[in-house]
Amino acid sequence: MRTNKFIYILLIIFPFIFLAPLTFQYLEVGNDFELYHFAYKKYIFELLKSGHIPLWSPSEGAGYSLIFNPLAQFVYIPSWIFYFFCFLIGDLSKYSFLIYTISAISIFNVGLFLYLRTFNIDVKIALTTVLITSISLKVTELLRFPNALHAFAWCRHSSWILHKST
């Protein structure tokens, strides 16, 4: 049982260790991370902080629904946990958004590990596979697109649930 706890803790913290230059703010994520994805989170957070639930974004054309906008992740439960955490610390910063984004790789790691274990793959092999996969360019490149990374992170959990139910 202690080994399982250690494995899950390792799976959760490993992306933060591997991405230490980002985790400790030596590097920043480029592309659309700040100008596009962070802006949605900041807009929603600031309105929530002022006591208003933002259902509509008036800044895009003649306006656009935030609830049905997949880029805003308005109804995504981890986003609301993130907003609550940011409310506790008092601000939603680009750094806290980056930590939220990296946490998606942790979600992916746990899901992939659970999925591989359903096939009775040895723990060491499954752990090694997950750690190598989580540092691959295809996974870490998605840091530029937080919504895509969070959507990708839950794919293995879905596969695990489907496999367990059959």
What role is predicted for each listed range?
Residues 5-10, 99, 127-131:
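Hydrophobic alpha-helical transmembrane segments
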Residues 2, 117-121, 166:
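Membrane-interface helix-boundary motifs at transmembrane edges
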Residues 15-109, 131-156:
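Membrane-interface coil-to-helix junctions
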Residues 1, 6-8, 36-38, 107, ...:
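Short hydrophobic/aromatic segments of transmembrane alpha-helices and their interfaces
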Residues 82, 113-117, 163:
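Membrane-water interface at transmembrane helix exits
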Residues 1-21:
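Start-transfer (signal-anchor) and selected internal transmembrane alpha helices
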Residues 158-166:
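Membrane-interface transmembrane helices that cradle and orient dolichyl/undecaprenyl
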Residues 112-135:
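Transmembrane-helix signature of polytopic, membrane-embedded enzymes
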